[in-house]
Amino acid sequence: MKVVDFIVKHIDENGMTQSEAAAVAGMSRQNFWDKLNNRNPRFNTMTRILDAFGYQIHVVRKDGETLNFCEADFFAAAEKENLYYDSLEAILVSMGYLFEISKKAEK
């Protein structure tokens, strides 16, 4: 499932209005929906929105083995370069990795 579809599904399942969802994400309603309707949003934007809704992204190997690179360093580089989410995901997939979206642990 594409990240935008995941976010829209979360909004629908929680019965949120566009304005409510935007407020949770810390954006104006127009800006929020512009980001989602772009269909190829920036990685930084998607991680910010997912975080606001209580989700996080991890990189996992398709074969289930342990990552052979530092996930934190990868995310720092992705944030610095401000890449498109789908482009970054396509690179990972070509290398045998996937993005996995999961609920953040309760504090």
Where are these regions (language model features)?
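A short, Lys/Arg-rich alpha-helix, primarily the initiator
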Residues: 1-16
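Short, basic-rich loop-to-helix N-cap that marks the start of a DNA-contacting helix
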Residues: 38-51
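Short alpha-helical DNA-recognition segment
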Residues: 15-30
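Intrinsic low-complexity tandem-repeat regions in disordered proteins
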Residues: 46, 56, 88-89
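The alpha-helix within a helix-turn-helix
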Residues: 11, 22, 50
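DNA-binding alpha-helical recognition surfaces that contact promoter or target DNA
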Residues: 5, 9, 23, 34
